[in-house]
Amino acid sequence: MNSQQFPRQAASMPSPQVSNSGASVGQNVQGQGDEVARDMDVQSRDLLGAGTVLPSRDDKQEPVVVRPYPQVQMFTSHHPLQPAPSLTMTAQPAHLTSAVPLSFSENILKQTSKSTMPSRPIAPAPPSAMSAVPKVSGQGTVTMESGLPQTSAIPVATISGQQGHPNSLHHIMAATNVHMSIIRSSAPGPPLHIGASHLPRGAAAAAVMSSSKVTTMLRPASAQIPSAAAAQSATQHIIHPPIQSRPPVTTTSLTPAVVATVSATRAQSPVITTTPAHAAEPVLRPTLSIQQHPPPSAISIQRSAQARDAATTRITLPTHPALGVQKPQLHAMTQKTLFGTGNPVAAATVAPILATNTLPSVTTSGSAPHTQVPTSTIVSMTMPTHSSHATAVTASNIPVAKVVPQQITHTSPRIQSDYGTERGNLIPIPGHRASPNPMTMEARSENRQPVPVQLQYFLPTYPPSAYPLAAHTYTPITSSVSTIRQYPVSAQAPNSAITAQSVASTVHLNQMQLINMDTSHARHIQGIQPAPVSAQGIQQSPFSAQGIQATPISTQGIQPTQMNTQAIHPATSITNQGVQTSSVSSQQASSEPKASVVLAEGATIVANPINGAFNATPGGTTVMQSHSQSPGIGSSPAQGSSPRPSILRKKPATDGTKPKADLHAAVAPGVTGDPGIADQPSAAASLPSSHHPAAAVPSPPSQPASGSMPSSIHITPATIPALSAPPPLLSNAPSGAVMPEAKVKEEAEPMDISRPVSVPLLPPNSISSPLTVLANNISIPVGELLPGASPRKKPRKQQHVISTEEGDMMETNSTDEERCHAVKPLTSRPEKRKSPPKEYIDEEGVRYVPVRPRPPITLLRHYRNPWKAAYHHFQRYSDVRVKEEKKLTLQEVANQKGITCRVQGWKTHLCAAQLLQLIKLEQDVFERLTVLQEGLVPKKKTATDDDLHRINELIQGNMQRCKLVMDQITESRDCMLKVLDHKDRVLKLLNKSGASRRLSKVKQKDKM
């Protein structure tokens, strides 16, 4: 995504990563270098995590730069990866504060952007601008730390509407603050945000999202103001302007100065909980998580004053050794900053993923390090690609927003356990951007304890299927809790990432995450990089918490983690092809199979577990499926596609099914059987591929490490054309990846097309196979399309679904905590709401139970205008046909029941008898009248009496009438009875014709 977003911004990629922190820097830098290179290549993701993030992730968990800890050092090994092209890392302070602008060589950026999404109109905003993020202004732009560059990417969309800031948000966590606001309602921007929200990776993504038009430009943070810049860098691509209304959202900078200590924030709002929440919401969330782990206090997120507008907010995560980086550096956190890596997650869409959880618990122990911190990383979730996703752009129509992650947050509760205070991970970020996929980053921090592995979700298991399934449900597995909260869909898995630690890979549930995407694929995108982490996770090292990232270092020496690959962030490349190449995988050079999975862009990808693929072969990268499905996928719209929602997006030629095939193939090899299992990590990877391929990319993280990384990306390319630039982005993502938690909302239930998509993560090298499974998850949100389904059709279907399914839409829209209606995509406004259905307990033990808004009760709702009433009313003569009477044959008449009785004429006789009675009555009257008449007639006619005469006449008349009646009735009766004269003949005929049948029956009875 980043690259998409920032393609133009070569410089943009701030080195911040390097800056991450002193020690970190070293490590980061190395990692970053690679990452950067990768980013550059990928460019797509570049903002996402700018190299930093990725490396961080490699560390193990803490992909995000945010981790202030020296983690980076671990990455040192990664250095080789450094190869990234000129990516310049500023050696800014590790702190977030430094806004280290990441510089990507223009070439790389361009390259990436070109290859990936030429179309993507998003241009990175100049770093300064970034800072300013004019659009964002309200936005809580959180600047990701420079270290987080990667992160920054995420923030972009994520923030989206959060902005808001500063105050409340920061409280929440400084970082959070921004997002918080989003969550809250905050930002006016939200409407815009919606679109942006999705964007997973960086502001750019957000921008894309936000503005329908390409218009959005993200500027790289690089130039940005130092402070702001630092934050910004990550953000840099803030979408701000492009973002349209929600520019702010874009704000990437997670970094917000920590205005408040994260720890405190936690309490502040369950939702936000973590600082990360703010700005990049998605990103942040992850960040949040990160913060979580460390002591609350440690995390202090500062928000620069300017932060509000610039969203420079810095987040300082607590430094935790766990991170690998030295604890001391609290601010180092900058590095961590919100998961620089995670940032990508920020891509709003992904937020749900919230890798966050993944990291968090990595470290079980309370030890300071708690790799957990990396958890934040999870944020990686970064949907970056997502962001790219046109989806954002569509903001309004895109359902994406739907995604509204429901905040994986629920997991948070679990997390909470470890660090009660830290709330960060909760960070719902829901508000953010209304984006459908609000990231919900739920940084979750995973304070949860490490419980690490637990995750293991293996979302994969259900991966593909689940997604489509309930968008709402998100399986979010919240990794932290070991529980797998199996929200069906939720990509949640992230946790696993965290736990992975040892597990390595820790699978990111990502795939779950994806799921949601539902609708908005944005969500899926969500994607979250987690995968990467998970891949890394493999590393046993304690980092494991760090999850992947660190792990790479440790375990892999290779550092395969190099999420860079991840950087791939499919968004960019994928978008085009969907491929996303996952070059990461190729990176594989290391032996890691990590194969980046890139998740395929499209839902298509879903099936493919890329991960596995790459697991299987490091090169695997193959995964890349570009499955360009992209359109469907949240992944950035392919190729410069417009911001329009993926659903609407036209598929690039590349997009066609072909990539998909690749994907599958890749997967098969790598994954093969594994998917189900390995996937754990993979899940992370699974990240919402849909949303942003970038996320998908994350899987690559695993890819090998060191130096090769950058190149590896390239290598992958062979496999996956699209791949090219994305990897770097990816890498950033990885750190974020760690936070697989983000659950993608499954937002859209049926509709959510994106949701299903999960990007498989590329799990840690070792884990790799698990990863693959995730990829599968990626299925298209919409209809759980089969992997085979053609992407082309899907989108249309999705759109339809979106418009039809109010519930889904609504859900997506809202965030976990509060349904953020912020901006529902025009098309799917109703759907947004669905996201929420997830239950979670925040760190403070407050239990949030999603309440599904019930539609108003209306009789009309179920009223259908039936045609029944018109059935008997005819409008033209032709409508009526006179029924012809059937003439019976003698045979038929003879066979009628009771025919003989009728022939006897009993009715006629009955009637005749009654007529006879009438005649008798008349006769009686006649006789009486006769008697009366005789009595009245004077015997003597001498005296004529008029009265008597008159009476006499009347009697005479009545007598005549009686005679007449009697005669007529008698006649009628006689005529009537004459009918019976033929009775004998009729009986004869009937017996003849009816005999055969009757006789046969009689005979049969006799025989019986």
Swiss-Prot record:
Query: What cellular-component terms does GO give this entry?
Result: Sin3-type complex
Q: Which N-terminal stretch is annotated as signal sequence?
A: none
* One Pfam family it belongs to: SAP130_C
Query: Where does the protein principally reside?
Result: nucleus
- Composition bias of kind Basic and acidic residues appears in 35-44
Task: Mark out the compositionally biased spans (Low complexity).
Answer: 678-697
Q: Does the keyword Transcription regulation apply?
A: yes
Subcellular location, in the record's words? Nucleus
What are the record keywords, sorted? Nucleus, Repressor, Transcription, Transcription regulation
> Its GO biological process terms?
negative regulation of transcription by RNA polymerase II
**Polar residues bias (residue ranges):** 1-31, 618-644
Ranges for region Disordered: 1-44, 113-134, 415-435, 617-720
Hey, which family's this protein in? Belongs to the SAP130 family.
State the function annotated in the UniProt record.
Answer: Acts as a transcriptional repressor.
Q: What is this protein called?
A: Histone deacetylase complex subunit SAP130-A
| Source species | Xenopus laevis (African clawed frog)
Gene symbol of the encoding locus: sap130-a
